[in-house]
Design a protein with these regions (language model features):
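Small-residue-rich segments of transmembrane alpha-helices in multi-pass membrane proteins
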Residues: 52-59, 112-123, 142-149, 213, ...
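Alpha-helical transmembrane segments
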Residues: 159-177, 287-295, 318-319
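Alpha-helical membrane segments and immediately flanking helix-loop junctions
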Residues: 81-82, 89-95, 110-120, 124, ...
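Interfacial helix-loop-helix linkers and transmembrane-helix boundary segments
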Residues: 40-48, 65-68, 72-75, 95-110, ...
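Transmembrane helical segments that form the transport core of multi-pass membrane transport proteins
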Residues: 215-299
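N-terminal alpha-helical transmembrane segments of multi-pass membrane transport
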Residues: 1-70
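Entry/N-cap segments of selected transmembrane alpha helices
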Residues: 32, 101-122, 273-299, 350-354
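Membrane-embedded hairpin module used as a gating/binding unit in multi-pass transport
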Residues: 170-243
């Protein structure tokens, strides 16, 4: 009988139940809430679901995920050594149509203006006591680009990766709720009714030349983001060249889906209780909202400048699409415009600043890496 009891005690002490802490329990509950949001509310389910499950698994004690070489540690290496974000960018490039930006290159300025949110949040984070590397990682949330946020944070402040990723993807899913009030605050009803002319046709040569030129210029200007921009442009070249259909299909479907699973699960695995349950996490979530709101406002206000300069030919609503939540932000511009003018179709015009925002966020990340990467 004593042997049986000792065996039971041994099983208990070796189990995860005995080592479970209050922090682990809280983070498992956080993971369950994220699963609920992903499944029941459909908030970025392709990303939040693996993040949530990774979070839950990370808070099981005595698993050896962080110490024993295995699939979980290998997934972590994919983030630590910057493998997954560039591969995601290849898929994004294959799914992105740069035609609206090529047809109206002035909208590149709107994509740049929307990055003001990144630097507003960076300044706010430094005022709250974060160091410059942590502040830069928090600020990039304002670009509304999950892979870029993960890429920059894994280089500058890997201990903040879980909080930054959850904030970035949460706000991306809430674009239709966050942006419209800010857009209406920065515009009048008459301005929202402005119709824009149709975009000119874009030639095949322009579509092929654009990713090549962007890859060369940005990579030479900002070498720290050469892998992101190179993969983005390569994926786009697969799509527009007309001769690599199989590669394009693989990049934007099978490969992108596989890497998304690994990237999101690996991000969730960083969300251990000792790293996540801090006052800093709430500050990051609040600063992320400030960054996103400031980026939206910055894009719309620059759209106002373009409206004035063009003699009321530019609808300032397209400026809000300068954040790189593709194509959600462009759809929001379209929806808000339709409410005040049911015959106003802004989607294609808004796609210009939207895809410019993808490039703009990568450039902002590269600038901060060059300045603060040390």
């Amino acid at each position: 009988m004593d042997g049986f009891m000792r065996a039971l005690v041994s099983v208990w002490t070796d189990s995860g139940f005995a080592a479970l802490t209050i922090e682990n329990i809280i983070m498992i509950l956080v993971g369950l809430v994220l699963l609920y949001l992903a499944i029941a509310k459909e908030y970025e389910p392709l990303l939040l679901m693996p993040i949530a499950f990774g979070d839950i698994m990370a808070n099981f004690p005595n698993t050896g995920f962080e110490t024993d070489m295995g699939v979980m540690m290998a997934i972590g290496f994919g983030i630590k050594y910057e493998i997954f974000p560039p591969l995601i960018f290849m898929g994004v490039g294959a799914m992105t149509d740069f035609g609206p930006l090529i047809a109206n290159p002035k909208t590149m300025l709107l994509g740049a203006a929307a990055q003001i949110g990144v630097f507003v949040a960076l300044a706010g984070a430094m005022l709250l006591g974060f160091n410059v590397q942590e502040a830069a990682s928090i600020g990039i949330i304002g670009g509304a680009d999950g892979p870029t946020s993960i890429y920059l944070t894994s280089k500058l402040a890997p201990h903040l990766l879980g909080a930054v990723a959850v904030a970035a993807y949460s706000y991306m899913s809430l674009v239709p709720l966050i942006q419209p009030p800010i857009m209406k605050l920065c515009t009048t009803k008459e301005q929202r009714k402005i119709k824009m002319t149709n975009l000119r046709p874009v030639t095949h040569f322009e579509k092929v030349a654009f990713p090549i030129v962007v890859a060369i210029v940005v990579s030479l200007l900002l070498p720290p983001v050469a892998s992101l921009m190179g993969m983005l442009c390569l994926g786009n070249l697969f799509e527009v060249s007309g001769v690599t259909g199989r590669l394009s299909d693989t990049a934007k479907n099978a490969l992108c889906n596989i890497v998304t699973i690994f990237l999101a699960t690996g991000t969730g695995l960083t969300m251990t209780g000792d790293k996540f349950i801090r006052v800093q996490t709430l500050e990051i979530i609040c600063l992320g909202l400030v960054a996103f709101a400031a980026g939206t406002a910055g894009g719309v206000l620059f759209g106002q400048l373009m409206r004035i300069a063009s003699g009321n030919k530019v609808n300032p609503l397209i400026g809000s699409a300068g954040v790189s939540a593709v194509p959600m932000a462009a759809r929001v511009s379209q929806v808000v415009g339709l409410r005040d003018n049911p015959s106003n179709y802004l989607l294609m015009q808004a796609m210009g600043p939207n895809v410019a925002g993808v490039i703009g966020t990568a450039v902002a990340a590269g600038t901060m890496l060059a300045q603060f990467g040390g």
